[in-house]
């Protein structure tokens, strides 16, 4: 996946400034940086969910939007209307819709895919619950299940571990590593320094501009972190 000169601005204020990099296929890549660095904006800009001032994102010489059906997106929980009357099962079933198109409705095959995805995140017992009745960790598992039901090749996740229980985080991380091992490409906005080395193959260190990008052991260094965070207090945790 190639990102070339990506620039994004809100109300004439630059949020992402001329970012160019290449994300490796079949890797777990984390986007790391201080608050306000543009991490979520970069993720959304790559998918075309926010307007770009300039730049392009391509895969196999085609715009990333061309591959929309092969891309699964897990948003931040705050972006989801939890009052919407939809059950856990139906939420996961939505993951099968991209492959169906506009006319077809989910059948037996799609329902089995949704059930299998719920099994993987250990949420079958909650299938008839309304999504608004779930805890943060349970809801995040459901979002992951929806992505699994899509059978995507590329997964974008925006702060999937924020405010969830440790058991849910461990289960989700195990699933992401399994997807990676099966050749899927996964990009995660992340904030916990202590887990970067354990979770990711590569990282994108960002502060509106690209500070560094590459394998964790080469990129997640004290010098580069200090450059990204400036005077903000940061406890260096590479290798932890």
Curated annotation (Swiss-Prot):
Coarse class of the protein's main subcellular location: membrane
InterPro entries per record: AAA+_ATPase, ABC_transporter-like_ATP-bd, ABC_transporter-like_CS, Metal_Ion_Import_ABC, P-loop_NTPase
Subcellular localization, as worded in the UniProt entry: Cell membrane
UniProt-listed SMART domains: AAA
Protein keywords: ATP-binding, Cell membrane, Membrane, Nucleotide-binding, Transport
SUPFAM superfamilies (alphabetical): P-loop containing nucleoside triphosphate hydrolases
Single GO molecular function: ATP binding
Gene3D superfamilies in UniProt: P-loop containing nucleotide triphosphate hydrolases
An example Gene Ontology CC term for this record: plasma membrane
Disulfide links within the chain: none
Amino-acid positions noted as binding ATP in the UniProt annotation, renumbered to this chain: 33-40
Alphabetized Pfam families for the sequence: ABC_tran
Every ABC transporter domain range: 1-233
Membrane topology according to the record: Peripheral membrane protein
Function: This protein is probably a component of a manganese permease, a binding protein-dependent, ATP-driven transport system. Probably responsible for energy coupling to the transport system.
Similarity section: Belongs to the ABC transporter superfamily.
Full protein name: Manganese transport system ATP-binding protein MntB
Provenance organism: Listeria innocua serovar 6a (strain ATCC BAA-680 / CLIP 11262)
